[in-house]
Swiss-Prot record:
It comes from Cupriavidus pinatubonensis (strain JMP 134 / LMG 1197). GO terms for molecular function: NADH dehydrogenase (ubiquinone) activity; NADH:ubiquinone reductase (non-electrogenic) activity; quinone binding. It is an enzyme of class 7 (translocase). This is NADH-quinone oxidoreductase subunit A. The keyword Cytoplasm does not apply. The lineage of its organism: Bacteria, Pseudomonadati, Pseudomonadota, Betaproteobacteria, Burkholderiales. It catalyses: a quinone + NADH + 5 H(+)(in) = a quinol + NAD(+) + 4 H(+)(out). Gene3D superfamilies: NADH:ubiquinone/plastoquinone oxidoreductase, chain 3.
Amino acid sequence: MTLEAYFPVLIFIIFGVVLGIALMSIGRILGPNKPDPAKLSPYECGFEAFEDARMKFDVRYYLIAILFILFDLETAFLFPWGVALREIGWPGFIAMGVFLLEFIVGFVYIWKKGALDWE
């Protein structure tokens, strides 16, 4: 496949970036700029904020998010593998078996280390 086949994609990306920058610039130039304390305060259910809007999150939230992404990617690899299993044969089956075994070992490791405990 030659690079000429990707030329429409490049044009589409350039057009999207230019259009996005143009629309944001027009909004910045033509939009009203009247800041006041009520507009700059964080909104919380119709009341004044009880605490600072930027609270520290527990590290466990990030850990759960990273684990979700990892296992979501695992699922993203499993679907095409399942569709193409007849064409790829035993080598593909063994490769996915090793891949799944690594994930299972990693999951058991983080479970035994207590990374999934919320106490």
